[in-house]
């Protein structure tokens, strides 16, 4: 029997999230959860995969999956083509939201805030540790632009490979990182009967304010 969408569900059984076990600083809790996710989640789940939501000039939302590539006390860093659709949207409206979901742990983290470009030095440092194919692809692909077919993309890649045949590809000027500076971070822990735990951290004048939200 084919299961209908209305019947598709699972119950959550793991331990809850209490204020007593949650630090005052959300970065500490995120690092703890992220470490546990890297130790627990298995392929095909990528623990650093996240959905990134942006809005265009008309206020229409757009969402896609990216990988978190750096985390410090300033915020959450990802890299992309600055000329891509997301890059243009962030130029027009420098705010975004990201969501991490770790199904084995039955956890979700939502993050909202302002976005800024990282320094050229930070972008270059990460670019240089990427696999060669990824570095060549950053030069070859006119991301988010219409191309005729796959053959055109492969032709662009072949031309790029010839261009860098005798030298290592450097970081393109149209490619680099963004850092999301969080103003709100919500931690969600699945619980039985859909009575989930939600702890919401909001940045206020004197630090972070933590509140519990109804599921």
Swiss-Prot record:
Catalytic activity: pyridoxamine 5'-phosphate + O2 + H2O = pyridoxal 5'-phosphate + H2O2 + NH4(+); pyridoxine 5'-phosphate + O2 = pyridoxal 5'-phosphate + H2O2
Single Gene Ontology BP annotation: pyridoxine biosynthetic process
Binding residue positions for substrate: 9-12, 69, 126, 130, 134, 194-196
UniProt binding sites for FMN: 64-69, 79-80, 86, 108, 143-144, 188, 198
Listed InterPro entries: Pyridox_Oxase (IPR000659), Pyridox_Oxase_CS (IPR019740), Pyridox_Oxase_N (IPR011576), Pyridoxamine_oxidase_dimer_C (IPR019576), Split_barrel_FMN-bd (IPR012349)
Cofactor(s) listed in the protein's UniProt record: FMN
Enzyme Commission number(s): 1.4.3.5
Alphabetized SUPFAM superfamilies for the sequence: FMN-binding split barrel
Function: Catalyzes the oxidation of either pyridoxine 5'-phosphate (PNP) or pyridoxamine 5'-phosphate (PMP) into pyridoxal 5'-phosphate (PLP).
Family: Belongs to the pyridoxamine 5'-phosphate oxidase family.
Protein name: Pyridoxine/pyridoxamine 5'-phosphate oxidase
Organism name: Stutzerimonas stutzeri (strain A1501) (Pseudomonas stutzeri)
